Structures are given as C-alpha cells and as structure tokens.
Amino acid sequence: MSGHNKWSSIKHKKGAADAKRGKVFTKLIKEITLAARTGGGDPDGNPRLRTAIAAAKDENMPKDNIERAIKKGTGDLEGVNYEENTYEGYGPGGAAVLVESLTDNKNRAVSEIRHIFSKHNGNMGENGCVAWMFDKKGYIEVEKSAAEEDHLMEVAIEAGAEDVRESDDTFEVITEVEDLETVRQALDGASIQYAFAEITMLPQTMVDLDDKTSEQMIRLLDALDDCEDVQKVYTNASLSDSVGEA
C-alpha cells in the first residue's frame, strides 16, 4: 500500500467514526461555505463547490444543511467569515507535513497547530518549506473487489484520468483537479463503486518510516486532523504496514 494511500485510508476510516460526532459535517460545511464565497453559489460554474457538495452527499449530509452552507457563503444568510491558510512542517523521521486550515481566528489556529507539531515530535516550518514536495490532484480510491483493473482503466482514462495505479488492495485513480468530477461521474455511470473521491496533495517522493516512527507520525496526523481549525492534512511519510490496520 502506498504511503499516500495508507494515510488516506486511515483518515477516511477515522472520518466514518468522526461523522457520528459531527466533525466531518463541520469540515464539509466550512468547505462549502468558503467555496461559495470565493466562486459563487452555482455549482455548475464553480468546480470547488461542486466537489464540496459531492463530498457532502457522499457523507449523507442533508440537503438543507448543504443549501444553508451555500447561502452563508454567498451572503444570503449570515455566517462566519472563514480564512483559508496553509501551514507546513516536519513530523517524526523528517517527513513533510502540509496542513490546510479554515478558521475564524487565525491566531488561535497558528498557536494550536504549532503546539500540536511540538507535542508530537515535529516542528512547524516557514511557508514554502515543504509545499513544493506535493502536487495538487484529484484522487479516487477503488477497492479491488469493486472493479476489474482493465475495465476501471478503460473507463477512467477515457473520462480524462491521468493515471490508474495499483496498490495492495486498491486502485488509485489520479486526475487533474478540474477533471475529478468528470471522472467520478464516469465511474458512477459505469457502476464502479469507489471508497472516496477528493482533491488532495500527492507527494512527489516518499520518506520511509519504521514501525515506531510511523506510530509517532500517526499520532501527529491524528492530532492535527482533530484540530477544529484544520481541514486537511497531508504527508509524504511512507507508513509502516503495521500501523492503522486495527
């Protein structure tokens, strides 16, 4: 299993539990609100909003919640003014960590994120210290049991996917950001079920971590992911096969 695939899978399994506590909905609402604020409330003309709505529907968010979040973004309803920022640093073993934040209090967010890095054997760096190690891409994970490789490859590439990669127990469909929804819809049309689809930051190269360091890295990533001001967390750590399987 690739390092990106490993953390993504752990994160989404964790998200299923978090959803019961409302954490996933909170993050999705923030993203929908900001997407509508920056690009308008019409998903047909706003790819970021379209992707955010699709993610919300995947999590079974009620339609009313989605519509309210859009209206808060467009100003039709009063809402919180979120600020978007990216923070960068290093985790255990020197692996890069990229943190996307949406917050109504930047000072609180910076302080909390810096504290989490320090507490978990990492350190927050300057802007630009690790961002260059990642590429922004669309990413769709398909369980091997859900599709034949040749069929998936044919459908995905025909729809505009950049690559289809094989991992231990999944296929990873990679797209340009603007092609993610088209490829997702093509998979839906071909009745190919996928575990999740998202816009992500794919690492260009990976940093191998041993069992102990992988466990430390997971604790850092989990703590960042649990921070109320954090939307997404990315790493180029190649995590040990022994972690995250429970």
Swiss-Prot record:
MF-aspect GO terms: DNA binding
Which InterPro entries does this chain map to? Integrase-like_N, TACO1_YebC-like_2nd/3rd_dom, TACO1_YebC_N, Transcrip_reg_TACO1-like, Transcrip_reg_TACO1-like_dom3, YebC-like
Alphabetically ordered keywords of this record: Cytoplasm, DNA-binding, Transcription, Transcription regulation
Pfam families for this protein: TACO1_YebC_N (PF20772), Transcrip_reg (PF01709)
- Which GO biological-process labels does this protein carry? regulation of DNA-templated transcription
Alphabetical GO CC annotations of the entry are: cytosol
Q: Where in the cell is it found?
A: Cytoplasm
Q: What is its main location?
A: cytoplasm
Family assignment from sequence similarity: Belongs to the TACO1 family.
| UniProt name for this protein | Probable transcriptional regulatory protein Dole_0371
Q: What is the lineage of its organism?
A: Bacteria, Pseudomonadati, Thermodesulfobacteriota, Desulfobacteria, Desulfobacterales
